[in-house]
Amino acid sequence: MVVDKTPNTLVSERAKNRVKSLVMNLILIVGSVVMLTPLLWMLATALSPNTKIPPTSLIPHDITLENFVEAWNFPKAFSPNPDHPVTMGTFFMNSLICTVCITALGIIVDSLAAYVLAFKDFPGKRLFIFLALATMMIPFYVTLVPEYLIIRKLKWINTYKAMIIPFLASGMGISLFRAHFLSIAKELEECGKLDGASDFRVYLTIVMPISRPIIGTMAILKAMWSWNQYMWPLIVCTDISKKPIQVALNMFRGLNLTEWGYMCAGMTMAILPLVILFLCAQKQFIGGLQAGAVKG
């Protein structure tokens, strides 16, 4: 039995929907303000003359780019070799090398492991799936000391290997790739096998080309995570010429004072690549998350 809604009922429902919409918009606005205020303060401080006292204004006064120039050249004072001075460009290059290697090689390792877990049956498969998921639940600080001892034993301290190799495989990456691969029709793999293709050829020419959304998502996630690494490089890297940008920002904090203008200029330069990356690839990022959530 269908009951027709009276005009008063329709008006009441529209009013409720408007109130809900207003409340949601208000929550989003408040959340945006809370999230953006620190960034606005950082940008205002970077564009204002350097000061030893933290400024309180969100509007820069006497706008200047001096802080960016000084921040770029500030590391020269800490360079162990005057003939090859260290600048912010050195730290950017270190971060770029680590980010590109972790992102590119990590996607290969995660996708290969996920392909096996999605398309192959073998003894202990469920255990490997469980272990991949379990690594997402273990805090990084639990494994920090054992990993450091291994790195020291291998004599990788102050090398790129120490900052790259431990993070090539990730439980989250394997899980997302596997979830996406499970949504792919198994007939595609079988057709490739009938044509005489090996497992690796099926993976390379059939599975990966139709997995671009999840590849894009994982590339963004891995790039953001590796670019923002702080604790691990701080521990395994004591050579200033090998430090990534996030660790190098510490030099603007002295024992008794902080160069706020230089630090905020350095932080602005440090986050700029990630902001550009996300703005250029946000559609792929959202589409990849949706694609990876089809099956578990």
Enumerate the predicted regions with their spans.
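A structural signal for multi-pass alpha-helical bundles of membrane permease subunits
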Residues: S12-K16, K20-G296
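Short, Lys/Arg-rich, polar N-terminal cytosolic tail immediately upstream
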Residues: M1-K16
